[in-house]
């Protein structure tokens, strides 16, 4: 039987602790995210990277292990407080992704891992406009997000066995993601999908995923600022 993390309606202290422990313990769910972010963003020493919706700071810290210079941002003060406690020496800021407290061209790259599904299209476009300001010309933006067409998400949508995360108000497939990014001034340079971490299902996804979107667990997109 599938067992999924059940996110609360709001991100409380327990949720932040869970996010942190999953990263520190390197759970299969975490490894899947880290692998996707690494492959998409290709972090290099000296890369200035803004991590949007950083939560407890897992991705921010992971990028720092490659010698990058990441900054994590999140609108939730509790998230930033916990990130600062866990990963001292790294920079974390309480900030709205549509109004970032950084100067123009402050970053080479940006990442949003399991974040854009929490915002609606108009906010997404506003965020892209802001990212184009804080990124250098031609800067890269990597996205890792749930695929609403995947079997698990369809089950959640129908409230069949699994319940939908109430904070997932902006689930998008790859085509929808591309349209919003283009509207926000980005050009998609790479688009792919990733299988899940559930052993039995993952085997099926690897075989069927190339042909059927029902078995594409995550949408992975790399876009470049125009």
Residue ranges of model-derived segments:
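Short catalytic micro-motifs in class I SAM-dependent methyltransferases
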Residues: 114-118
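Conserved N-terminal segment of class I S-adenosyl-L-methionine
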Residues: 1-103, 109-113, 125-128, 170, ...
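S-adenosyl-L-methionine-dependent methyltransferase catalytic module, highlighting the catalytic core
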Residues: 2-3, 7, 11-15, 19-31, ...
């Amino acid at each position: 039987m599938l067992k999924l993390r059940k996110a609360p309606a709001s991100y409380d202290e327990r949720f932040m602790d869970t996010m942190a422990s999953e990263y520190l313990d390197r759970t299969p769910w975490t490894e899947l995210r880290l692998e996707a972010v690494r492959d998409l963003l290709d972090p290099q020493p000296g890369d200035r990277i803004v991590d949007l919706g950083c939560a407890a700071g897992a991705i921010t810290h992971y990028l720092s292990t490659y010698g990058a210079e990441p900054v994590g941002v999140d609108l939730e003060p509790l998230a930033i407080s916990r990130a600062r406690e866990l990963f001292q020496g790294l920079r974390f800021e309480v900030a709205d992704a549509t109004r970032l407290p950084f100067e123009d061209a402050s970053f080479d790259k940006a990442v949003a891992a399991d974040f854009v599904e929490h915002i609606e299209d108009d906010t997404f476009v506003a965020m892209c406009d802001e990212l184009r300001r804080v990124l250098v010309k031609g800067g890269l933006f990597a996205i890792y997000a749930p695929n609403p067409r995947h079997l698990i998400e369809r089950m959640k949508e129908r409230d069949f066995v699994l319940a939908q995360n109430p904070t997932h108000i902006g689930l998008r497939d790859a085509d929808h993601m591309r349209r919003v990014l283009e509207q926000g001034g980005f050009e998609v340079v790479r688009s792919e999908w990733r299988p899940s971490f559930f052993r039995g299902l993952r085997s099926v996804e690897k075989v069927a995923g190339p042909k059927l979107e029902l078995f594409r667990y995550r949408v992975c997109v790399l876009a470049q600022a125009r």
